[in-house]
Amino acid sequence: MPPRILIVDDSSLVRHLLRQCFESEPGWQVSGEACNGEEGIEKAQEVHPNFIVLDLSMPVMNGLDAAKILSKLMPAVPVVMFTSFTTSNLESEALAAGIRRVIMKSGPLAELVGCVRALVKDAA
C-alpha cells in the first residue's frame, strides 16, 4: 500500500519541502499537515495516515509527547522524527515514545525517503 503521510512540523517551509519531496514519489500522498504535536494528534485521527513524520521542537506540544500519544492511538503506524535538534538521550527517549527512527534535518532528504519506503514496506 502506498504511503499516506502526515507531516507535523512548526515550519511551513519544511512542511512544503517534505510535501513536494514525498508527492514526487509515484503513488505517495501527503494526507495531512500539522504545525504542532497537539494538532498532529487531531489530524492523525481525522486523516488516518499510514506513516507520520514529526519534528521534535514545536510549540504547544513537542514531538516526543505527541509520539507517546500517537503510539497508543495508532500503534501500527510508523512514526519517524525529522529534527535539527539532538541530545545525548534523544535516541532512547524517541524509542521509548514509540518513534521508529530519528533522522537529522541536516542530512540528505533521500535518507528520509528511504526510511519511509522501508518502514511502509515492513508494515505491509
Kindly label every feature range from the protein language model:
Residues 2-14, 18-22:
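Conserved acidic segment of CheY-like receiver
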Residues 27-35, 43:
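Short hydrophobic/Thr-rich beta-strand motif most characteristic of the beta2 strand and flanking loop
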Residues 36-39, 62-66:
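Acidic catalytic/metal-coordinating carboxylates
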Residues 45-47, 69-76, 97:
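Conserved phosphotransfer cores of two-component systems
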Residues 47-53:
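Active-site beta3 strand of CheY-like receiver
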Residues 58:
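Receiver (REC) domain active-site loop signature in two-component systems and cognate sites
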Residues 65, 86-103, 107, 111-114:
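Alpha4 helix (beta4-alpha4-beta5 surface) of REC/receiver domains from two-component response regulators
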